[in-house]
């Protein structure tokens, strides 16, 4: 019997009760705000939406005044948000229940390690596996931080629903508190008045570490070690999960990312993790009241206690407390040294006893900062050993064990920061350096071979830098060199791990990578033997992915590159772009090209004796590589995951996965289990069939790519259709991120960033990037020969990659709505442009029919009943928002709204994104 997934709970009764209660409270609050007469409009809208009487719904919405629109759009935006919270609460409950009752589920770590423990290389795999979720600031998290904080309070209250219902806590008081928070959220601005700055994005993402990720990663790593030990495997400091971050270092297309934001990103991380340690030490100080008259500590604990400046007269016989005080004092000095300021108390989870803890360091016996996390851990280990010597092993568990594990994982910062820049920027900077040094006057005009010759000569034979104080530099070059200089300083200060990778967007040639090496050399991060920052190419378009094999083969053939890779444990990371490849060639072409590229790049690495590891640039939507993480990882090519995998976590996905520590634990558990299972298991039923499967896919994908590009790039009306029949213009003005919607002025589809492209197709409910071109391509293959449908059905049943590919299309189609999409099409100004919709509609219907035929299903989402039920319960609410949005866009474009009313459109964008849950 296959194990069930816990993607969402099956306890629909509880969810229904909670949603009914939340809806009742929201209705009462809204009635009080607008009155009974106005609320009847909301009630009539709901009835029409549930009956799917969209013609009448459109008429009613058209007669709502701008003033009434504000509360009505807010109501229908808040309602899906409350439903989300209820579902998340129940998922967290289900996760705890399954773990505490020792129930098996798909991806459960205990099962994964049990299966692996019996293999000869099981211990090696468990020690080496490393999964790295990389949190990014891509602008798809439309909710304000304030709204997220309020939803956290509601989440905590709903966790108590069962207790309130059973009378364990006072039901009436519980209802009153819940009502208060819903009232607050209903009367709080949903949309930001001003665009986020990078510093806001850094601060915002830190709340996930402070609130859930530190605890979840620490708990999971401890459980990982304990499970291995249970099966006789003693692991030496494994790191199954470490975190990565782009915020503050990703300057591709974002002029607001600077040397200052890079420094701030690292500094705030140190502040948060050191505050966490300080809080833990405060808790240990309060509880470790062991008296030396009863338990004699070892000499090292006595030494630590003697160095404490705790002035309390009551601590004379409490050496452990004084030892913890001394350690905490050193942490405070460390925080001052690393952040250049005292603790800012970003968290308030544990207060400090200032009379005992704030004693200043005396001049005679100054408290010194820790030189490294190793020294901090050594002091904790001394306390652990003393407890073991006295038979107090039980006292080690809890806060002491947790903080020791956290030090092993995080050290003095939370996540390794990636730097990223577009290859064209690097080329411009290198061209300026070479010209200023009188080496090459017009570098950009050289051939690829000539470029590599010039760059290699500088890297291998010239120890001096190209830049000189005597030569004036452009603002761009100054800014880039400042960022690299800051990176070097941070590595010197916080350790090599704080910045490990630099990603090159739009890598198209070997010279792109050597150009980055030149820039790194300028600040001392690269020399002939060593690269302190790994050079990571990002292959994004279909063409670049097709060329990736040859590019990497040429790059890896150079001796200097092999020297650099050798300093990185013989790993070479390659980033794969899901977004641009999809925008370039459609869903099938993107997915298949990425699959083949991994196979080819893995083989090239083996030829050169290099371990190729992949960094998957996945977004929240299927059109940007999204979908269930477990399925996405286990459907990767066998052999493509060595012992390390990185993947981006973006936008609203961060809140969905990591907003709660229990759900965060579960998602991290899925990532580890999926990675291990993919490393050791050939998932396909019969590996001998893979060659024939590949031939079939090559044929289908070629057709799909042609069909997709014919509409997107060859139809002269498609560009206007996208810009007129979607809210792209309104999305671009929404204050949801620090980065512009395009790298330059948008004059064609290729110039638009993938995120607003996908986000806008989600808003108009076409979900175009997740399915267009799929139906016609499969239909052509099915019609080509008798038995082809059966072949596709067999592939779906036996090949995880193909199964995942089609399941994602199934999910996307279920969230689309062609009736609503038709209404958006009417926003287009000319009939020729509006007619593009009918091409899309025909392909949508064909895709739905073909997908169901291959799956042998009667309806969409037959394999995912919980999502099907969830969508059924929420669709009426956010379908209304689409009709409201369409009406508001009409008014806005016809100058019937003033600038203050534009936020009404933004409110609907927020609500639709909230209802869909993975929109960008």
Curated annotation (Swiss-Prot):
Keyword Magnesium: yes
Top-level taxon of origin: Bacteria
Cofactor: Mg(2+)
Gene Ontology process terms (BP): carbon fixation; oxaloacetate metabolic process; tricarboxylic acid cycle
Record-listed E.C. numbers: 4.1.1.31
Keywords, in A-Z order: Carbon dioxide fixation, Lyase, Magnesium
GO cellular component, one term: cytosol
Keyword Transcription regulation: no
Enzyme class: lyase
Family: Belongs to the PEPCase type 1 family.
PANTHER family: PHOSPHOENOLPYRUVATE CARBOXYLASE (PTHR30523:SF6)
Physiological role: Forms oxaloacetate, a four-carbon dicarboxylic acid source for the tricarboxylic acid cycle.
HAMAP family the UniProt entry points to: PEPcase_type1
Protein name stated in the entry: Phosphoenolpyruvate carboxylase
Provenance organism: Streptococcus pyogenes serotype M3 (strain ATCC BAA-595 / MGAS315)
């Amino acid at each position: 019997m296959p194990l069930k997934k816990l993607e969402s709970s099956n306890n629909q009764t509880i969810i229904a009760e909670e949603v009914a209660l939340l809806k009742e409270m929201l209705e009462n609050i809204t009635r009080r705000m607008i009155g009974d007469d106005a609320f009847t409009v909301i009630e009539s809208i709901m009835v029409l939406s549930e009956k799917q009487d969209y013609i009448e719904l459109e008429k009613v919405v058209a007669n709502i005044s701008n003033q009434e629109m504000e509360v009505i759009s807010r109501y229908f935006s808040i309602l899906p948000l409350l439903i989300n919270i209820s579902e998340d609460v129940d998922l967290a409950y289900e996760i705890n229940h399954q773990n505490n009752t020792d129930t098996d589920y798909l991806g459960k770590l205990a099962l994964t390690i049990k299966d692996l423990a019996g293999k000869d290389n099981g211990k090696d795999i468990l020690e080496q596996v490393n999964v790295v979720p990389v949190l990014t600031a891509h602008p798809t998290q439309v909710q304000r931080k304030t709204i997220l904080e309020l939803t956290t309070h509601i989440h905590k209250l709903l966790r108590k629903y069962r207790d309130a219902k059973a009378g364990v806590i006072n039901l009436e008081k519980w209802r009153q508190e819940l009502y208060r928070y819903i009232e607050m959220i209903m009367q709080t601005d949903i949309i930001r008045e001003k665009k986020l700055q990078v510093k806001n994005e850094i601060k915002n993402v830190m709340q996930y570490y402070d609130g859930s990720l530190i605890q979840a990663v620490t708990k999971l790593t401890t459980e990982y070690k304990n499970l291995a030990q249970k099966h006789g495997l003693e692991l030496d400091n494994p790191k199954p999960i470490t975190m990565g971050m782009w915020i503050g270092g990703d300057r591709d297309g974002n002029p607001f990312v600077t040397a200052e934001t890079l420094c701030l990103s690292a500094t705030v991380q140190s502040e948060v993790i050191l505050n966490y340690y300080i809080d833990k030490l405060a808790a240990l100080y309060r509880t470790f009241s062991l008296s030396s008259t009863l338990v004699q500590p070892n000499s090292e604990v006595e030494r630590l206690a003697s160095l404490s400046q705790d002035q309390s007269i009551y601590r004379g016989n409490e050496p452990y407390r004084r030892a913890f005080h001394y350690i905490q004092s050193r942490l405070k000095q460390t925080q001052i040294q690393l952040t250049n300021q005292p603790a800012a108390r970003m968290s308030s989870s544990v207060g400090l006893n200032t009379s005992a803890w704030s004693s200043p360091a005396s001049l005679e016996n100054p408290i010194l900062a820790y030189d490294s996390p190793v020294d901090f851990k050594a002091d904790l280990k001394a306390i652990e050993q003393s407890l073991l010597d006295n038979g107090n092993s039980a006292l080690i568990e809890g806060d002491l064990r947790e903080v020791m594990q956290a030090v092993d994982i995080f050290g003095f910062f939370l996540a390794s920061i990636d730097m990223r820049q577009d290859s064209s920027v690097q080329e411009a900077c290198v061209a300026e350096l070479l010209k200023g040094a009188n080496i090459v006057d017009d570098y950009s005009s050289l051939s690829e071979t000539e470029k590599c010759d010039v760059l290699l000569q500088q890297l291998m034979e010239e120890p001096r830098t190209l830049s000189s104080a005597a030569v004036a530099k452009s603002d761009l070059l100054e800014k880039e060199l400042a960022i690299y200089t800051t990176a070097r300083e941070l590595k010197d200060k916080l350790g090599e791990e704080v910045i490990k990778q630099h990603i090159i967007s739009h890598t198209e040639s070997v010279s792109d990578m050597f150009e980055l090496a030149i820039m790194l050399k300028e600040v001392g991060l690269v020399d002939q033997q060593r690269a302190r920052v790994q050079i990571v190419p990002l292959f994004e378009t279909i063409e670049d992915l097709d060329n990736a094999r040859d590019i990497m083969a040429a790059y890896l053939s150079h001796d200097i590159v092999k020297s650099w890779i050798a300093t990185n444990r013989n790993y070479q990371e390659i980033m794969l772009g899901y977004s641009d490849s999809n925008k370039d060639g459609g869903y099938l072409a993107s997915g298949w090209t990425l699959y083949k590229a991994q196979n080819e790049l893995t083989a090239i690495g083996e030829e050169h004796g290099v371990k190729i590891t992949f960094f998957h640039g996945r977004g929240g939507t299927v059109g940007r590589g999204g979908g269930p993480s477990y399925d996405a990882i286990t459907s990767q090519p066998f052999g493509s995951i060595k012992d390390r995998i990185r993947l981006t976590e973006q936008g609203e996905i961060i809140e969905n996965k990591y907003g709660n520590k229990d759900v965060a634990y579960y998602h991290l558990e899925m990532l580890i289990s999926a990675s291990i299972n993919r490393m050791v298991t050939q998932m396909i039923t019969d590996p001998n069939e893979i060659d024939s499967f590949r031939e079939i896919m090559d044929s289908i994908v070629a057709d799909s790519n042609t069909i997709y590009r014919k509409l997107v790039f060859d139809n002269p009306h498609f560009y206007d259709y996208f810009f007129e029949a979607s809210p792209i213009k309104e999305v671009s003005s929404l204050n949801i991120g620090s980065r512009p919607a395009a790298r330059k002025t948008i004059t064609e589809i290729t110039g638009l960033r993938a995120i607003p492209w996908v986000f806008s197709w989600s808003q108009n409910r076409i979900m175009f990037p997740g399915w267009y071109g799929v139906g016609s391509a499969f239909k052509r293959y099915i019609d080509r020969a008798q038995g082809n449908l059966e072949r596709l059905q067999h592939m779906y049943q036996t090949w995880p990659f193909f199964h995942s590919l089609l399941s994602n299309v199934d999910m996307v189609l279920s969230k689309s709505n062609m009736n609503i999409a038709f209404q958006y099409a009417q926003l287009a100004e000319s009939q020729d442009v509006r007619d593009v919709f009918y091409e899309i509609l025909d392909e949508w219907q064909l895709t739905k029919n073909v997908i169901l035929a291959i799956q042998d299903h009667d309806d969409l989402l037959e394999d995912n009943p919980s999502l099907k039920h969830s969508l059924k319960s929420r669709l009426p609410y956010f379908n209304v928002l689409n009709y409201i949005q369409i009406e508001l866009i009409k008014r806005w474009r016809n100058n019937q709204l003033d600038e203050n009313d534009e936020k009404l459109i933004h409110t609907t964008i927020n609500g639709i994104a909230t209802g869909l849950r993975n929109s960008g």
